[in-house]
Amino acid sequence: MSQQETHGFQTEVKQLLHLMIHSLYSNKEIFLRELVSNAADAADKLRYLALTNDALYEGDGELRVRISADKEKGTVTIEDNGVGMTRDGVIEHLGTIAKSGTADFFKNLSGESSKDSQLIGQFGVGFYSAFIVAKKVTVRTRAAGHKADEAVLWESEGEGNFTVDTITKASRGTEITLHLRDEEKEFADDWRLRSIITKYSDHISVPVEMWQEGTPESDGADGEKIPATEGQWKVMNKATALWMRSKADISDEEYQEFYKHISHDYTDALLWSHNRVEGKQEYTNLLYIPAKAPWDMWNRDRKHGLKLFVQRVFIMDDAEQFMPSYLRFVQGLIDSNDLPLNVSREILQDNHVTKAMRTGITKRVLGMLEKLAKDDAEKYQQFWAEFGQVLKEGPAEDFANRERIAGLLRFASTHTGSAAPTVSLDDYISRMKEGQTKIYYIVADSHEAAANSPHLELLRKKGIEVLLMSERIDEWLINHLTEYKEKQLHSVTRGDLELGELEDASEKEAQEKLEQESVALVERIKAALGSTVADVKVTSRLTDTPACVVAGEGEMSTQMIKLMQAAGQPVPEVKPTFEINPAHPLVSRLNDLQDEAAFADWSNLLLQQAQLSEKGSLADPSAFIKLMNQMLLANMK
C-alpha cells in the first residue's frame, strides 16, 4: 500500500539547491565524484556494522558501486549495495543539512559566483550536487536488515519539496537516478562517464563498476569466427586502499583526489604526509594540511578528527582522540593494526595505544609544518594566514610540544614595519642586541594601536625590536608562553622594562636623578588622583609622550580584562600604575601650576588620555569630554 508523503526542504537546503540549479560550478562533473564517494562510504559503513551482525550482508558480501547511463532517456544511475537508508533516514539526510552554523554560512554568501563557489566547496554539498546537472532526482533505497517491502522511493525536482513513498526493493543499498537537463546530456555518454570515473575513483577502496556491452559473433581477418561475448560489469578502479599502497606508486594527482574524497573539499591540499609506523604500535597515517580553512573552523559544535580504520575496515569518522584541538584543521586517516575492530569512542578515550598514536601523529604534523616553514616560507605564510590563530592555542593545550609550537608562530614586528605576521621567535632572537635577555612584545586591539603605542618610544630609540600582537587570542597565548629558548617574553606595558645591560650607567644615573627631582610632583599627582590609580611613577619608557598607564607585575593586563568581559566573566577591579614623563613640556608646566584645583584637572586629563591610548575606550567618555572642554575654555580666555 502506497504511503506517499510530500515534505518541504529545510530553508538552507532550498538556498543550496537554488545555487546548484543555477549552475554555480564551471566544473560540473564533480557531482559524480560526490555521489560515488557517498556510495563508497555506504559500503564502508555496512562492512563495519556486519562485523557484529553478519546477517546484514544478506548473502551478498561483495560490496561495490555500479554506474550506468541511458543515453535515450538521458539518465545516469549510481547504485551501491551498502548500508542503505530507512524512511526516516531518507527524510533526515535528503531533506535537511545536519550541520551546526548552517544559517550563518548562507549569510556569508555574496552573490558573486567565484567567491560563493569557493565557499560552497568548503561547506560540502554531497548528495545535493546531483542538481548541478539533473532536473529531477529519483532515489530508491532499502536499509540493510530491513524487509524488501520496507524500501523507500524519494523524488524531487529540486524546487521547494520532495516526495517519499514506500516501495518494494529486492536488494539492499541505494540507487540514485539523475534525469539530466537537456544541456547536460553529455554525461549520459558512455565515454564521458568512463573518463570521469577513471579520474575520480582510483583511490576508492571498493570496486566501481560500469556496464560493458557484449559483442555479437563476427568474422576475423583470416575468416575465423570470433565468438560473441556477453555484457558484463567491469571494474574501473584499482579498488585497493590507497594508503596501503607504496608511496612510490602514488602520484600527486592521486593523493589530491583522495584528499577531496575524504574531506569533500573542492580545492587541492597544501601538503600531505604518508607514513607507515612499525614498532610497539603498527599503523599507517595519511595526513593532509588543507589550503583553506573550513567555513566553520571556530564553531564549537564542529566535528573534527581523523577517519579511523582498523585493519583496512572503516570504523568511524571524526576520531578526535588522535589529534589535539589546536591541530583540528588536519584532515586524513589512520589505519591501526593494534586496536580491536569493535573499538568505540569511549574505548579510544582512555587507551594507551590511542595515546601513543596521538603523540606520534602530533609530532608528525608539527614536523610537516617545521619542514614547510624551513623550505618554503611563502607557502608557510599561506598556511599561517588560514590557520595561524588556531595554532596559537597550542602552547596552552600541549605542554610537551610547547617549544616546537612556539617556533612555528609568526608575529608582526617593529623590525619589518609591516602588519604582516612574518617574524618567528627565532628570527627575533637572531637580531637581539648584545646584552639583551628578553623578548619584548606588546598586545593591543589593532596593529596600528600596537605599532603607535607610546610604550615603544624608548625601545624604538634604542633600536630594540618589539613583537606587535593584535589578535584576540594573543593575550591568551602569551599567558601560556612565558619563555622561548630560555629567553623570557616580556610585555612593554607591564611593570618595569627591565632593560638590564641595554641601559648604560649614564642613563641609569640620569633616570635616578630625574626621579629624585620629581618626588614632589609625583606626590602632588598621587594626592590629586587619589584612589583612581595604584601608584604614580616617573617613566623610564617614554620619550615623546607626557604619560602612560601600565599594569603591575602579576596583575591582569588590559587585553585579558577585555577578553574576560567579552566572555561574560567577572573581572576584579584593577587600578593602573600612572607613569609620567617630567621631560615633556605638558608635565613640566603642570609642575609649575599653583592652583591645586587646576592641577587636579590637568592630572586627570593626562590620566584619561593615557587610558584612552592604552584601552581604546574610557569608562565615562562623557566626563572626559566635559573636562577637556572645560580646560579648553579656561585656556581660551
Curated annotation (Swiss-Prot):
Q: Which organism is it from?
A: Shewanella baltica (strain OS185)
Q: Cite the source lineage.
A: Bacteria, Pseudomonadati, Pseudomonadota, Gammaproteobacteria, Alteromonadales
Task: Please give the function described in this protein's UniProt entry.
Answer: Molecular chaperone. Has ATPase activity.
What the entry lists under Pfam families is as follows:
HATPase_c_3 (PF13589), HSP90 (PF00183)
Q: Where is this region: B?
A: 346-562
Q: What is the name listed in the Swiss-Prot or TrEMBL entry for this protein?
A: Chaperone protein HtpG
Q: Hey, which family's this protein in?
A: Belongs to the heat shock protein 90 family.
UniProt-annotated stretches for the region C? 563-637
Q: Where in the cell is it found?
A: Cytoplasm
Extract the GO molecular function terms from the UniProt entry: ATP binding; ATP hydrolysis activity; ATP-dependent protein folding chaperone; unfolded protein binding
